[in-house]
Amino acid sequence: MGEHNHAEWRAAVHDPEVVRGMLEDYRAGLGIDADHERADRTAGRRVQRPLLVLWSTRDDLEDLYGDPLTIWRDWADDVTGHGLDSGHHIAEQAPEDLTTALGEFLA
């Protein structure tokens, strides 16, 4: 993450309002967000634009959920992407690779 980013993160997780916001985001994922996803699936709604999926290869995402591209193909027809050699914090740990992938996708 880098010393500067780690210091900012450490300060943020000691701010009760930041922690509350983080927990509310997780709570929404189990509640209202999940309700909206079920409604979208029931209605047959899908992502109608090209979708780029990037993920860290030094994280447990694939172990927990399987292939991210396969998962997102349930939600969109035009899915591309790949793993980046990074831990959980892709923007901080692999900024060049992330920038390249985004630039190629948006070109």
Which ranges hold each PLM region?
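Catalytic active-site module of serine/aspartate enzymes centered on a nucleophile-bearing elbow/loop
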Residues: 76-107
